[in-house]
Amino acid sequence: MSSLFQTYGRWDIDIKKAKGTYVEDQNGKTYLDFIQGIAVSNLGHCHEAVTEAVKKQLDSVWHVSNLFQNSLQEQAAQKLAAHSAGDLVFFCNSGAEANEGAIKLARKATGKTKIITFLQSFHGRTYAGMAATGQDKIKTGFGPMLGGFHYLPYNDPSAFKALGEEGDIAAVMLETVQGEGGVNPASAEFLSAVQSFCKEKQALLIIDEIQTGIGRTGTRFAYQHFGLS
């Protein structure tokens, strides 16, 4: 019996090693890996430059917490900021944590509470992430959910009319391509309507790029295809 908590439905494939776009199981069978660690290893498994950089860092400093300055962390943040519409970077452990931080920031910065998200969206399995997710199956068995989230049809520029004069909107949160929801790309017309709505309501626009960021759609971030800011 496994001692691992079964949070995922794992395949019966035990990986022994990986290189480039291939993984090999304990029996020596090789697989072409189209998943790449859910796009974490999108440079390929065991890329020489990445492996060398990790080894070098392990010989220097492992972890000293956020109580100390870290020049390499600052350099990485500057590079990320230079290729995005933002000026500041929050390093975290997962997409769900990033979304939690964005939700907290939106409410704290605006003083408002409502977050508009979309049907078939996926924003994580923490409580705020599940609450933001527009799929009931993700939430089954975990209620009651965190309040303040409202769901609209995705890719429908007219959907915002349903909100009328509703106020207290802190942010609109969306994926430029819905991943878990079925690989649904947003249209330029829809995203333009989203940005106009945010400006009208003085709400923040949160773009969840967990699956589309870092060059996976041809630009550094997918929102850059549409001139969003």
UniProtKB/Swiss-Prot annotation:
InterPro entries associated with the record: Aminotrans_3, Class-III_PLP-dep_AT, PyrdxlP-dep_Trfase, PyrdxlP-dep_Trfase_major, PyrdxlP-dep_Trfase_small
Cofactor binding note of this UniProt entry: Binds 1 pyridoxal phosphate per subunit.
EC annotation from Swiss-Prot or TrEMBL: 2.6.1.11
CDD domains: OAT_like
GO molecular function: identical protein binding; N2-acetyl-L-ornithine:2-oxoglutarate 5-aminotransferase activity; pyridoxal phosphate binding
Ranges annotated as spanning the membrane: none
A GO cellular component entry from the record: cytoplasm
Transmembrane found in the keyword field: no
Matches recorded under Gene3D superfamilies: Aspartate Aminotransferase, domain 1, Type I PLP-dependent aspartate aminotransferase-like (Major domain)
Residues bound to pyridoxal 5'-phosphate: 95-96, 122, 208-211
Compartment(s) where it occurs, according to its Swiss-Prot or TrEMBL record: Cytoplasm
Paired cysteines (S-S): none
Cofactor(s) listed in the protein's UniProt record: pyridoxal 5'-phosphate
Binding sites annotated in the UniProt record for N(2)-acetyl-L-ornithine: 125
Catalytic reaction list: N(2)-acetyl-L-ornithine + 2-oxoglutarate = N-acetyl-L-glutamate 5-semialdehyde + L-glutamate
PANTHER family documented for this protein: ACETYLORNITHINE AMINOTRANSFERASE, MITOCHONDRIAL, AMINOTRANSFERASE CLASS III
Protein name: Acetylornithine aminotransferase
Species: Bacillus amyloliquefaciens (Bacillus velezensis)
Lineage, highest ranks first: Bacteria, Bacillati, Bacillota, Bacilli, Bacillales
Gene that this sequence comes from: argD
